[in-house]
Amino acid sequence: AYFGTGMEFPAILDTKNLDLPYNKKSKKIKLHKSHEWSLMLDDIVEWYNRAGIILIYRPNEVSLKWWLQAGGFNITYPNYDYYIDEKTMAKHIAIQNDSILKFAHKHKLTWEHHHKHHDILIAKKFPK
């Protein structure tokens, strides 16, 4: 499920909110995705210490270009009005990417290239 501004579910790190998209009786692993959680990674580690984290990194300019090619402001869902324009979106991408890189460095995570997309790097942090 996707969480964040303009998404069906807000990017709030509250168990009730995080459980909303899922069947309450299910024991399956839940996958929660949000660009905004890049700014809350330390909180996720502290509050949900049994949760794994997978970081996806793509350079700022490439991220913006991909987002525009995927439809940018011209798609109906999610609603990206919050980001106002391309310049503002680029600023948000840069802030989120910076947060991802700082978290990976702080936790000494290893980056691996995506198997198909050479410009995407992946790092994983799982509980010990």
Model-found features: residue ranges?
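PAPS-dependent sulfotransferase catalytic domain
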Residues: 35-113, 117-127
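Conserved two-lobed SF2 helicase motor
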Residues: 28-35
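PAPS-dependent sulfotransferase catalytic core
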Residues: 1-28, 128
